[in-house]
UniProtKB/Swiss-Prot annotation:
It comes from Rattus norvegicus. Residues 30-55 are annotated as: Basic motif. Residues 56-84 are annotated as: Leucine-zipper. This is Basic leucine zipper transcriptional factor ATF-like 3. GO terms for biological process: dendritic cell differentiation; myeloid dendritic cell differentiation; negative regulation of transcription by RNA polymerase II; regulation of transcription by RNA polymerase II; response to virus. Residues 28-91 form the bZIP domain. SMART domains: BRLZ.
Length: 133
């Protein structure tokens, strides 16, 4: 009949496991040094992980603030667009140029009518005065 561990915990044996020799003081020292080295490495790893987590949290907070600022700017620009669209609609009702039967008004004579499309300057000789959709 085998005996289990005592009521308070683990059964300890002074006999080495089969195939193992009893621990020498030199082996004990190595084991202690290895455990200490492992403990220090684990502390370093946990500290590094905590620092990385803190950095990500700070970056998240910063991005949330930037996002909030950009959303407010978008709302402001949408309101400005709505206001300008309304102003344009009101202006179109009264603009004499839009009531004219011609949709194009020449701003200046075209001095370079012979230019090809790739030679022409960036500014057009004609401007469309119709409504934009």
């Amino acid at each position: 009949m085998s005996q289990g561990p005592p009521a308070g915990g683990v059964l300890q044996s002074s006999v080495a496991a089969p195939g193992n020799q009893p621990q020498s003081p030199k082996d004990d020292d190595r084991k202690v040094r290895r455990r200490e080295k492992n403990r220090v490495a684990a502390q370093r790893s946990r500290k590094k992980q905590t620092q990385k987590s803190d950095k990500l949290h700070e970056e998240h907070e910063s991005l949330e603030q930037e996002n909030s600022v950009l959303r407010r700017e978008i709302a402001k620009l949408k309101e400005e667009l709505r206001h300008l669209t309304e102003a344009l609609k009101e202006h179109e009702k009264m603009c004499p140029l839009l009531l004219c039967p011609m949709n194009f008004v020449q701003l200046r004579p075209d001095p370079v009518a012979s230019w090809s499309a790739h030679d022409a300057p960036d500014h057009p000789s004609f401007i469309w005065l119709g409504t934009l959709v």
